[in-house]
């Protein structure tokens, strides 16, 4: 299976690091690609129950605007834990610890530079999208306001093969704190979810909290404009369909 193959390959990598004698000062950073199995890859439901539990408790999978299409775990660990190691004392990752901090791939850049002993990665002209998440990794008290208070934006203005239902239509979404808003370009509709209370995104709160939705929508639109994001194109009208 793919899991067995991945496990064997990761084991080969760790054994090679050990054979080089550098496992004491080597960090293993492991993460998945975005989301779980796509709609096409999922095929039949587990044990043919008729219930899609591949991503449970998350909704949908890779390519979808819902959490099953974006949320994945991130694991950071020393290749070999050496008690009393001076190198590892500089980054004392608690064993078996779990953080609920909201991270994105760009956060790895400033974090890894810090772990490697880099002094600075900024210049007068540089713009760094990521945030150093070392404190979250070390288990410092949450919430980490810099991580969890910022807006995370996901933008997919393209058509998924076959245009299946389930959030695979062209979309943009934003998460800030506990809240997540999604905009679907084809139908020009918004959805709003409180992820802490509803991780499965089963209850759309867009009608119940219009003020919250409006603030998230304005933030999302401005961030997309600031970054020059491409919009979906109406094939017949041959014009952009910007976020409404």
Residue ranges, per PLM feature:
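Catalytic nucleophile-loop/oxyanion-hole region of alpha/beta-hydrolase
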Residues: 1-5, 102
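Beta-strand elements within well-structured catalytic alpha/beta cores of enzymes
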Residues: 3, 10, 27-32, 74-75, ...
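Metal-dependent active-site segment of extracytoplasmic phospho-/sulfohydrolases and closely related
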Residues: 5-42
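Non-transmembrane alpha-helical segments in soluble domains
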Residues: 7-14, 18, 109-113, 134, ...
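Loop/turn elements at helix/coil->beta-strand transitions in domains of secreted/extracellular proteins
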Residues: 22-28, 70-72, 148-149, 177-179
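Surface-exposed patches in mature extracellular/periplasmic domains of secreted proteins
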Residues: 24-25, 120-125, 232
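C-terminal cap/loop subdomain of S1 sulfatases and analogous C-terminal strand-loop tails that border
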Residues: 36-65, 82-97, 101, 105-195, ...
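Long, internal low-complexity/basic segments
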Residues: 108, 164-167, 186-189, 195-244
């Amino acid at each position: 299976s793919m899991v067995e193959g991945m496990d064997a390959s990761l084991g080969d990598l760790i054994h090679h690091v050990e054979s080089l004698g550098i496992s004491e000062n080597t960090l293993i950073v492991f993460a998945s690609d975005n989301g779980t199995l796509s709609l096409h890859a999922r095929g039949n439901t587990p044990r043919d129950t008729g219930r899609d539990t591949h991503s449970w408790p998350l909704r949908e999978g890779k390519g979808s605007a819902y959490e099953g299409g974006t949320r994945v775990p991130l694991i950071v660990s020393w290749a070999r834990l050496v008690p009393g190691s001076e190198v590892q004392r500089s980054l004392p990752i608690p064993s078996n610890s779990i953080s609920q901090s909201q991270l994105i791939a760009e956060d790895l850049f400033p974090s890894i530079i810090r772990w490697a002993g880099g002094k600075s990665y900024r210049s007068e002209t540089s713009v760094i999208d990521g945030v150093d998440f070392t404190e979250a990794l070390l288990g410092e008290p949450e919430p980490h306001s810099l991580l969890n208070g910022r807006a995370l934006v996901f933008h997919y203005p393209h058509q998924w093969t076959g245009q299946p239902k389930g959030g695979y239509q062209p979309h943009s979404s934003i998460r800030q704190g506990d809240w997540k808003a999604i905009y679907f370009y084809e139908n020009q509709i918004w959805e709003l979810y409180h992820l802490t209370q509803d991780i499965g995104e089963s209850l759309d709160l867009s009608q119940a909290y219009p003020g919250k939705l409006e603030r998230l929508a304005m933030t999302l639109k401005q961030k997309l404009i600031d970054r020059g994001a491409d919009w979906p194109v109406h094939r017949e009208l041959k014009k952009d369909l910007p976020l409404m």
